């Protein structure tokens, strides 16, 4: 492993060690470009590869998951991933306050109810956000909860980390359940112990219940020196609530630690519980959500009304890596993960007309961003949803580029609203409606059936190209 003072990838200077695992070590580091202080997780590639495909999958899954959920204020953010011939580097947000568990110990073993409630609010907000992205943590425990030091004296803010054991919704089997047994014994849900398949969301809720109990009581609800006895207590939901728990706290804990996953409280029910509602304020919409009443910037009057032309370098930059076959389909993605690419031989006027038809049937209004000129429709349109979604109304831009007189690329991107709702619209409505006018390569058609979120254009575990 590198030593203090080492400069990695000509970008970050490593500082003191913050911790280590079997295959990795975490350092405080400084960006040589911005001067920002970050945390860098250094993974030994050779050791990870020797550990087998499971470790490789875990590392790649962690990258994919952190990119899905890392913009939430209560989730540790992944800035970038780099790789050399021997090492993989995760550059992450530095959380200066350390583990929540250390703060718990320093406070005498347990927290006051108001402090515990504040951290629990933030934990639930992060977990709910992850679930909305189809991500289930599966290893929630105080060691994986960090607290930043915001300098306000208010105790800092919670940050969820370590997504190495997380599952994506695509990991479910045909029965709609997860089947991989994982997690830390004291925090694991009874249905995971039973190995009969489980719902990732309800399993995470159980772990949240164990964490809340620990924060309020100062000890775990389920503990025994004999692991099988402890599992028996977990399976039966056998625990005792301390005398100092308030009635509302007792009520919530009993719902969280319900051994029956079908009757266990859900997050939607949890946020309405009297104990949780005290002092809880709904988080404002994300700052990157566009204001819907914001006027469109006027198009440049000198702009050519024909579709913008793309040269070979533009096409390569829009495709996945250098495999252009991924473009000629109704399932392409640009290098920006939220953008969708469609390639067609139909003229721009036909494309715009089809988008207008989709908008009319799917509760969108259409605003053309360029006006008609000599039988050519505008080459960019905005689809504005009028239904309220998770993050307001969905807004989508579609821009048409001319590759040749018989080949057009349509780039579709979200400008406002929730990412998952946008992806659902693309999968359920947009692609099927464009299928008959788009080109599809045989390779892409075959792979569409089992599509997973891309981790990166080139896996950090793959060998560098010569």
UniProtKB/Swiss-Prot annotation:
**Binding positions for ATP per the UniProt entry:** 18-26, 41
In the record, biological process GO terms are:
signal transduction
One Pfam family, short name please?
Answer: Pkinase
- Quote the record's domain comment: The activation loop within the kinase domain is the target of phosphorylation/activation by upstream protein kinases. The PPI motif mediates the interaction with the ABI (abscisic acid-insensitive) phosphatases.
The EC number of this protein is 2.7.11.1
Instruction: State the conditions that upregulate or repress this gene.
Output: By drought stress and abscisic acid (ABA).
PROSITE patterns listed in its UniProt record: NAF, PROTEIN_KINASE_ATP, PROTEIN_KINASE_DOM, PROTEIN_KINASE_ST
- UniProt GO MF annotations: ATP binding; protein serine kinase activity; protein serine/threonine kinase activity
The taxonomy runs:
Eukaryota, Viridiplantae, Streptophyta, Embryophyta, Tracheophyta
Q: Which cofactor does it need?
A: Mn(2+)
Stated name of the protein: CBL-interacting protein kinase 20
The domain of life is Eukaryota
Q: Region (PPI) spans which residues?
A: 337-366
Protein species of origin:
Oryza sativa subsp. japonica
Domain (NAF) spans: 297-329
